[in-house]
C-alpha cells in the first residue's frame, strides 16, 4: 500500500512537465551599396504579432564604421509572439536623422541579409528635432 501511495505522490510531484521551447537565434548581416562616410549607429529591431498588433520585441544598437555588419540576436520564447517575425534596420549618424532603412519578414529561417536602402538625402538627412 505504501508503494502505491509513493507512486501516486511521485506522479503528482512530477506532473506533466514539458521542457521549455529553446531560444531562437537570429543571425544575419546588414549591407548597403554605398560606403559609410563616418561612424554610424545601426539599429536592428525585431517585431512580432501580439494580440493582433505588430509590436517591437527587441532592439539592438550597433556602432560601426564599416559595412557589412554581422549580428546575432537571441530571442527567448516569450518574445516570439503569435506568428511571423519582422526585422527592420535603420542607419543613422550621431546628431542626425535616419539615413537608410531595410525591412524584411523572417520566414522560417534564422540567417538574414538586410540590404539598406539609402534615403535620397543620404548622408545629410536631418531628424525633425535637430534643425
From Swiss-Prot:
It comes from the Bacteria. It is a lipid-anchor. GO terms for cellular component: cell outer membrane. A lipid is attached at residue 16 (N-palmitoyl cysteine). Residues 1-15 form the signal peptide. A lipid is attached at residue 16 (S-diacylglycerol cysteine). Disruption phenotype: In mutant, only a small amount of YscC/SctC is properly targeted to the outer membrane. Mutant is Ca(2+) independent for growth at 37 degrees Celsius and secretes smaller amounts of Yop proteins. Keywords: Cell outer membrane, Lipoprotein, Membrane, Palmitate, Plasmid, Signal, Virulence. Pfam families: YscW. It is found in: Cell outer membrane. Belongs to the ExsB/YscW family. Involved in the synthesis of the type III secretion system (T3SS), also called injectisome, which is used to inject bacterial effector proteins into eukaryotic host cells. Pilot protein that is required for the proper localization of the secretin YscC/SctC in the outer membrane. Also required for efficient oligomerization of YscC/SctC and stabilization of the oligomers. Interacts with YscC/SctC. This is Type 3 secretion system pilotin. The gene is yscW.
Amino acid at each position: 500500500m505504501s508503494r502505491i501511495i509513493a507512486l501516486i505522490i511521485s506522479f503528482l510531484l512530477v506532473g506533466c512537465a514539458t521542457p521549455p521551447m529553446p531560444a531562437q537565434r537570429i543571425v544575419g548581416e546588414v549591407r548597403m551599396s554605398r560606403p559609410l562616410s563616418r561612424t554610424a549607429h545601426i539599429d536592428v529591431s525585431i517585431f512580432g504579432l501580439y494580440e493582433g498588433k505588430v509590436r517591437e520585441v527587441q532592439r539592438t544598437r550597433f556602432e560601426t564604421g564599416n559595412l557589412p555588419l554581422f549580428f546575432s540576436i537571441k530571442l527567448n520564447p516569450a518574445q516570439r509572439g503569435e506568428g511571423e517575425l519582422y526585422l527592420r534596420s535603420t542607419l543613422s549618424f550621431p546628431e542626425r536623422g535616419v539615413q537608410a532603412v531595410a525591412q524584411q519578414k523572417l520566414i522560417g529561417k534564422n540567417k538574414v541579409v538586410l540590404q539598406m536602402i539609402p534615403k535620397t538625402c543620404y548622408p545629410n538627412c536631418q531628424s525633425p528635432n535637430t534643425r
